[in-house]
Amino acid sequence: MAAGHMHMNNGSAVSGEYKKIVYWICTIAALGGLLFGLDQGFIANSLETIEKVYFLGVEGGEKYAAILATGGIIGALLSGIFARFLGRKRSLILAGFLFSSLSIVSATLPAIAVLSACRFGLGFAVGIASFIVPLYLSETAPASIRGSMGSLFQLMITIGIFLIAVTNVVIARIFLNPHVALPIMFLVIAAFSLIMFIGSFRLPESPRWLMLKGRKAQAREVLARV
């Protein structure tokens, strides 16, 4: 009976650990998609506020808006290298760090050259997330929820675009001073980014990447947990 009781306790511990891992995988999948959408949709209802602060004009505003896509293309192209050499987990941490740090720097309203560099970096992070998050999910998420996680990532992109559009309009109407409104707009992204950045440290590494690196014991340990 004692042995049976111990077995039940071990089973409960394993079940609890499994639920925690699944929770964090779901959270990062959601945040990765959300941040993708937040940064993609940010410019739509913030450009007018940005122009009031930086006096960009139509052409300058268009150039600033396009920088994100440029960074995104380069980030996506280099994501395979990051995934291979850094691993999936550390690549996610890198993306979270870029999202959070560059959003915070942007909120300080730096010179336009620095702001543009931050937007390029945010695009770079979007490119990394767009490649790494689905890859990580395909290799790590439990088979029972793997398909749902891919759908969740796509859904959260759309939600992020909608959310930032509504949020920026509300912020601009509440805070009429653009020098106050614009930092708050950037800090909204920073808040979600910090959750992703910190949460990524708690994720298990991809078992496939561990196997590719010859770390078979660690890979089996991760597979046993998920």
Task: Kindly give the residue locations of the regions a language model identified.
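Transmembrane-helix signature of 12-pass secondary carriers
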Residues: 2-225
